[in-house]
Amino acid sequence: MADGQLPFPCSYPSRLRRDPFRDSPLSSRLLDDGFGMDPFPDDLTAPWPEWALPRLSSAWPGTLRSGMVPRGPTATARFGVPAEGRNPPPFPGEPWKVCVNVHSFKPEELMVKTKDGYVEVSGKHEEKQQEGGIVSKNFTKKIQLPAEVDPVTVFASLSPEGLLIIEAPQVPPYSPFGESSFNNELPQDNQEVTCS
């Protein structure tokens, strides 16, 4: 057989330069077809929450961190999602911890207290003259304590970066028959700064 000859005819379709959307008789109908579906089945003149809520609240296969999704007890049990208004339970042995950014407040302008199962953090600036006006800042943040935390053991410390770190050790679960497998000693943090 001579060089460059093949025993059978061979054509390479890749050598043909062809635009399938231009040359095909289906090209004009392919991109225009809606496949029998409306692009937006709902009325677009309605306010967005009414037409977006069904799409956002449909069942998802995993956890979805959105405030619009209703969470029932089955979703809580199935996916380990805490009920609304509750903090996720801490791991056994680890303290419950929350950080609040208070970088624009001085320690003496902050107050942390526990009341009715909540930690309440509040801060207030006195009025300051800034850029042609008087500025006064104040805030109050309430954080619900988990059931595993005793409100009496809550303490707060302020980091140099302006983060208020609120911590509390977990209450050990009840142990029947006086068998104690838990360490009753709590670690002491000597570097904490109390905010009043």
From Swiss-Prot:
Entry-linked CDD domains: ACD_HspB8_like
Record PTM text: Phosphorylated.
Modified residues (Phosphothreonine): 63
One Gene Ontology cellular component annotation held by this UniProt entry: nucleoplasm
UniProt keyword Protein transport, yes or no: no
Origin superkingdom: Eukaryota
Induction: By heat shock.
InterPro entries: A-crystallin/Hsp20_dom, Alpha-crystallin/sHSP_animal, HSP20-like_chaperone, HSPB8, HspB8_ACD
Subcellular location: Cytoplasm; Nucleus
Keyword Chaperone among record annotations: yes
Assembly and oligomerization: Monomer. Forms a ternary complex with BAG3 and HSPA1A. Component of the chaperone-assisted selective autophagy (CASA) complex consisting of BAG3, HSPA8/HSC70, HSPB8 and STUB1/CHIP. Interacts with HSPB1. Interacts with DNAJB6. Interacts with BAG3.
Record-stated family: Belongs to the small heat shock protein (HSP20) family.
Role played: Involved in the chaperone-assisted selective autophagy (CASA), a crucial process for protein quality control, particularly in mechanical strained cells and tissues such as muscle. Displays temperature-dependent chaperone activity.
Protein name per its UniProtKB record: Heat shock protein beta-8
